[in-house]
C-alpha cells in the first residue's frame, strides 16, 4: 500500500523530499466519539519508515464528536498544539487548570 507520493527537488547541493499524504491515504482510528487520521505511525497503525519527521512524532487530525473526548491522561516530554476548526473544546489538565478553545484560538501545552 502506498501511503503518499514523494517528489524530490534539487536545491543546489541538497535534495529536498516532500511526502504528500492525502487524508484518505492516512491510517485512521474511529470510535463512537472520535475520527482520527494519522500522518505517522500511531497506536496499532504501523508502517516501516513512517515514524515521524525529526522530533515531530505525532500529527493527527482528530474530529471529536460533541460530548466526546479523551479521558484524563498524562504526557511527558511533549509539546502539544491543539487547533479547533469548528465547535468548542473544553480542556482540563492534571493540576485542575481549565480552559475552552473555539475557532480562531490555538493552545500550546508543554508537558
Model regions and ranges:
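Short histidine-centered beta-strand/loop micro-motifs
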Residues: 68-75, 92-94
Amino acid at each position: 500500500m502506498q501511503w503518499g507520493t514523494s517528489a524530490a527537488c534539487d536545491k543546489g547541493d541538497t535534495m529536498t523530499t516532500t511526502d504528500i499524504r492525502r487524508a484518505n491515504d492516512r491510517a485512521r482510528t474511529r470510535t463512537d466519539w472520535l475520527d482520527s487520521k494519522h500522518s505517522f505511525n500511531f497506536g496499532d497503525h504501523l508502517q516501516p519508515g513512517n515514524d515521524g519527521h525529526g522530533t515531530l512524532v505525532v500529527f493527527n487530525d482528530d474530529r471529536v464528536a460533541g460530548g466526546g473526548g479523551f479521558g484524563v491522561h498524562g504526557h511527558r516530554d511533549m509539546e502539544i498544539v491543539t487547533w479547533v476548526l469548528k465547535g468548542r473544546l473544553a480542556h482540563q489538565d492534571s493540576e485542575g487548570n481549565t480552559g475552552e478553545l473555539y475557532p480562531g484560538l490555538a493552545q500550546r501545552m508543554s508537558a
